[in-house]
Amino acid sequence: LDTDLQGTMPEVYASERAAFL
């Protein structure tokens, strides 16, 4: 799931990751 987000929308992936951290 993380890979899909990173591939399609890097910005959203970064935001999600930042939220987790």
From Swiss-Prot:
Q: Does the keyword rRNA-binding apply?
A: no
Q: What are the annotated GO cellular component locations? A: extracellular region; S-layer; spore wall
> Keyword set for this entry?
Cell wall, S-layer, Secreted
- Location in or out of the cell: Secreted, Cell wall, S-layer
Which domain of life does the UniProt lineage start with?
Answer: Bacteria
Keyword Ion transport carried by entry: no
Summary of the function given for this chain in its UniProt record: The S-layer is a paracrystalline mono-layered assembly of proteins which coat the surface of bacteria.
Name recorded for this polypeptide: S-layer protein 2
What is the source species?
A: Bacillus thuringiensis subsp. konkukian
